[in-house]
């Protein structure tokens, strides 16, 4: 009887361990080769569907500052790499997790002489959508404008980026939104309040 109980207990424990391991792996954001995205590495962000545009980059919308976050027009463009900085890193702080607030920063200098962090900008009067720009948010959105999060899609390895910094401020009520494209005057800008844009992360 004790032998049967022991075997049954071992089987249950094995299933529990498998569940925990699978859940833990699912918490990590994966790059295009299935490896966890790490905060100290550089990555290109690009759409899953290549005819939607190329890699992410900084775009001059109207020859003025700040620069906007956008996409290269085609997959042939070099684009700019980014680094991810989690708001609340875990003990394994180098790994980026889904549904957690983080900062996204282009690893490049800006002609505007300012931070190259992604930031939630003002609502565009023509499209009614909130644009993603670069710079440090000191007041516009309660200092929460620099925090985004990577969320899963039904397809493994494909993600959306959202602005919804509820980890930074759990008691705040935000008008959350998902990043999508906005085509304007031959340029591709990134903005909220459209359909979700599936993205992947390609290590440099």
Curated annotation (Swiss-Prot):
| Entry-linked SUPFAM superfamilies | STI-like
GO terms assigned for molecular function: serine-type endopeptidase inhibitor activity
Q: Which UniProt keywords apply?
A: Apoplast, Disulfide bond, Glycoprotein, Protease inhibitor, Secreted, Serine protease inhibitor, Signal
Task: Kindly name one Pfam family recorded for this protein.
Answer: Kunitz_legume
Per the record, GO CC terms? apoplast; extracellular space
Question: Outcome of residue 173 to E?
Answer: Stronger interaction with SCP1
Recorded coiled-coil stretches: none
Q: Where is this site: Important in determining the strength and specificity of the interaction with its subsrate?
A: 173
Cystine bridges: which residues? 65-112, 164-176, 169-172
Q: In which tissues is it expressed?
A: Expressed at low levels in non-mycorrhizal roots.
Q: Which residues are glycosylated?
A: 62, 141
The induction field says: Accumulates in roots during colonization by arbuscular mycorrhizal (AM) fungi (e.g. Rhizophagus irregularis).
Q: Name one GO biological process term.
A: response to symbiotic fungus
Summarizing the function annotation, the protein's role is: Protease inhibitor that, together with SCP1, controls mycorrhiza establishment and arbuscule development during root colonization by arbuscular mycorrhizal (AM) fungi (e.g. Rhizophagus irregularis), probably by degrading SCP1 in the apoplast of the periarbuscular region.
Q: How does it assemble?
A: Interacts with SCP1 and CP.
Protein name according to UniProt: Kunitz type trypsin inhibitor 106
């Amino acid at each position: 009887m004790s032998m049967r109980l022991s075997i049954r207990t071992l089987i249950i424990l094995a299933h529990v361990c498998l569940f925990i391991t699978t859940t833990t792996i699912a918490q990590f954001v994966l790059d295009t080769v299935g490896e966890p995205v790490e905060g100290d590495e550089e990555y290109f962000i690009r759409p899953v569907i290549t005819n939607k545009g190329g890699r992410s980059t900084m775009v001059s919308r109207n020859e003025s500052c700040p620069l906007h976050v956008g996409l290269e027009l085609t997959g042939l463009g070099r684009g700019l790499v980014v680094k991810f900085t989690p708001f609340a890193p875990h003990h394994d702080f180098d790994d980026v997790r889904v549904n957690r607030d983080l900062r996204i920063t282009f690893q490049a200098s800006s002609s505007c002489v300012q931070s190259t962090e992604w930031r939630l900008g003002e609502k565009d009067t023509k499209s009614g959508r909130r644009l993603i720009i670069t710079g440090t948010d000191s007041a516009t959105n309660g200092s929460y404008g620099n925090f985004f999060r990577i969320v899963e899609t039904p397809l493994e390895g494909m993600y959306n980026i959202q602005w919804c910094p509820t980890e930074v401020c759990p008691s705040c009520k935000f008008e959350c939104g998902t990043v999508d494209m906005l085509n304007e005057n031959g340029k591709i800008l990134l903005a909220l309040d459209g359909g979700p844009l599936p993205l992947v992360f390609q290590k440099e």
